[in-house]
């Protein structure tokens, strides 16, 4: 297997608005990331993925881009970005940036010109249709129709919010504009891109109505606007024109790609270095996009999804491993549900957090840690829908009410799933607002910040933060690299349902076993003899696992 830096790297996703504010306006900024680079270096991070920082009206927190060549003033200046790239490079930390190429903001100059003049060259950059009636009954990802009125008998298409008009990838001129943007940022010094919602760029039969899949009379945009026939030509062209250098790391948010087609996306000649798999992250939802349709699941179900993903990816290319991101709730609350540690039970929180950390660092693929995950951050406590910022959360609340749930039930659904759970300000210290800002934070802080803050955990050698540091060191250790990074994943079949057990097997036959008890009861195990690499308890038995115990052993 080809060896390359991004396969061996551990990444850290930064949601800049919530990471560190340096000027007291309540919004995190690029200088805040720069200030905390030593913290990331100490953690063992090789690259950071920074969520959008471009000029934006912030209807969708930066995923509505108004200018791909600039920096939003709330985040700083281009000089700040240049300095961040320079200082990160000096510390051996590469920078990956979010690239949103399915849509722009409705405030982008292209769209404004297209609206102002139907004969503008930019009209073809978007999907405009002349029609007296709504062109089709397709539902957007954020609810309601994908079609929005743009003057008399004219409509434009939006996969997400109406403030995010979709780009028309059928236009060669538009595609060349997008490739110029990628080349600009690579010349700036970024080491790669995370491509947002990239499998939505091709639409088929977008003007045709279909049998509704819900009482709103609409059908999901996934039917005609996700991973459609013809997308491969677009992705291949982008790859050939911009991304042929194997040193450039590319990771795609690529929903809708079946496992049997993964080699086209991440194989030796694939379009991207890796893709995110949503199957196990969305285990708590039934098919569709309604958060009130919560799915019952067991740890047996989780294991099936995890190992199906791992086994499918390892035969076709390379994967991106994560448990949390800016679009997900916190993993504590998702995977442990009602068993998640009470806020004042810090020992239980350590056990559960270290169990999840061991799973994350034991799997095959490039590891992504989301900000605050290394501290054991949990979902927040939102007391009303007014406390939320996320537009999707507000739409999901409305959907639940329309489906007949009362306000308390609807709030419970969005409390469980809201993207704002992972977007709350990072807790640096026990000071006001967790040391995130000297002003009023743009989103409320989690009320447990003093108990789990980074400063407190840095001073405690037995903290979850130190456990993460140690795991990252173990993963990168030369003695473990061939097993833990490049080795095959093989499930240990005789493990009990609530025990996730697997081996990482190097080409030379060396093995590392990982055993994780996801339950609050002692469970039977059959751990191999060997060197204990990590253990979240002070003792180890080969035949049993304590509640939430996680053990990694290099087999003899």
Name each region found by the language model.
Residues 1-529, 534-556:
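Active-site and adjacent substrate-binding regions of carbohydrate-active enzymes
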């Amino acid at each position: 297997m080809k060896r390359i830096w991004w396969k061996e790297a551990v990444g850290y996703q930064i949601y800049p608005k919530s990471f560190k504010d340096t000027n007291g306006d309540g919004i995190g900024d690029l200088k805040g990331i720069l200030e905390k680079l030593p913290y990331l270096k100490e953690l063992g991070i090789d690259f950071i993925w920074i969520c959008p920082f471009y000029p934006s009206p912030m209807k969708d927190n930066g995923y509505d881009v108004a200018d791909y060549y600039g920096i939003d003033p709330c985040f700083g200046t281009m000089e700040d970005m240049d300095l961040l790239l320079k200082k990160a490079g000096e510390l051996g930390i590469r920078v990956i940036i979010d690239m949103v190429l399915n849509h722009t903001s409705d405030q982008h100059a292209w769209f404004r010109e297209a609206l102002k003049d139907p004969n503008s060259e930019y009209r073809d950059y978007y999907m405009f249709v002349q029609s007296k009636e709504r062109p089709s009954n397709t539902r957007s990802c954020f609810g309601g129709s994908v079609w929005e009125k743009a003057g008399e008998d004219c409509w434009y298409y939006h996969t997400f919010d109406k403030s995010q008009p979709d780009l028309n990838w059928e236009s060669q001129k538009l595609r060349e504009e997008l490739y110029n943007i990628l080349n600009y940022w690579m010349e700036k010094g970024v080491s790669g891109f995370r491509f947002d919602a990239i499998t939505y760029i091709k639409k088929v039969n977008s003007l045709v109505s279909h049998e509704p899949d819900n009482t709103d009379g609409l059908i999901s945009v996934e039917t005609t606007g996700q991973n459609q026939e013809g997308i491969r030509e677009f992705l291949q062209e982008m790859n050939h024109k911009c991304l042929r250098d194997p040193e450039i790391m590319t990771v795609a948010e690529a929903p809708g790609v079946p496992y049997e087609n993964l080699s086209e996306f991440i194989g030796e000649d694939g379009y991207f270095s890796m893709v995110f798999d949503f199957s196990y992250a969305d285990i708590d939802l039934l098919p569709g996009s309604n958060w009130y349709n919560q799915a019952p699941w067991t740890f047996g179900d989780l294991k099936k999804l995890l190992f199906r993903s791992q086994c499918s990816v390892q035969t076709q290319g390379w994967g991106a491993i994560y448990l949390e991101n800016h679009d997900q709730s916190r993993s504590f609350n998702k995977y442990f549900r009602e068993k998640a540690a009470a806020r004042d039970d810090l020992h239980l929180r350590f056990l559960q957090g270290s169990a999840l950390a061991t799973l994350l660092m034991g799997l095959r693929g490039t590891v992504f840690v989301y900000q605050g995950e290394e501290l054991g951050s949990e979902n927040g406590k939102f007391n009303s829908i007014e406390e939320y910022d996320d537009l999707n959360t507000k739409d999901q609340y409305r959907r639940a009410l329309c489906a007949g749930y009362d306000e308390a039930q609807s709030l419970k659904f969005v409390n469980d799933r809201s993207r704002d759970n992972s977007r709350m300000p990072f807790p640096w210290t026990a000071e006001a607002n967790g040391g995130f800002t000297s002003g009023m934070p743009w989103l409320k802080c989690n009320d447990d910040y003093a108990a789990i803050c980074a400063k407190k955990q840095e001073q405690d050698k037995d903290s979850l933060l130190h456990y993460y540091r140690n795991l990252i060191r173990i993963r990168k250790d030369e003695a473990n690299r061939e097993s833990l990074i490049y080795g095959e994943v093989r499930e240990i079949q005789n493990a009990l349902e609530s025990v996730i057990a697997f081996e990482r097997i190097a080409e030379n036959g060396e093995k590392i076993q990982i055993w994780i008890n996801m339950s609050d009861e002692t469970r039977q195990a059959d751990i191999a003899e060997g060197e204990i690499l990590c253990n979240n308890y002070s003792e180890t038995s080969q035949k049993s696992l304590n509640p939430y115990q996680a053990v990694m052993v290099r087999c003899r």
